[in-house]
Amino acid sequence: MASSEQQIRFEHWANSQSLEAIVAASHGLPEALALVGHIVSISCFWAARVEGTAGNLDPWPTFTAPELETELRQLLDRWLRLSRCTAMDAQVRYVSSDGESRSNLFSEVLQEVLLHGAHHRGQIALVLRMKGFEPPRSTDFIPALRTAAIQKGI
């Protein structure tokens, strides 16, 4: 199994690939930018839960492409820090969106963030293709390993 650091670096790389494809599609395609913004927002939301500081976040914020580049870099640093100081089997206690007290392992939270991002990256690729633009060549894990981008850091 890939290390948590490798998974986090992959998530950053894949999200960055999607954002680059959106930017290359001329005017940035607001619906595709909104999906990247949603990925960022939900990732921030889960990071805040791990940190014990969760509050109300807008799940669909509006960002520009340069703002998203900055947000993605900050998320990479934040999740790398969390993975270094949080055991994979640590309990993350939080209040869910339905107001219920919940608890999940840090490893489960990380998997949620990764799978959520993958889901929306698929939607981004579809939006790009439907609008006549090229999606990223790949945002899959194995091709990412071949680039070495997630091995040595980005």
What would you call each of these model-derived segments?
Residues 5-61, 98-154:
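Short, contiguous alpha-helical
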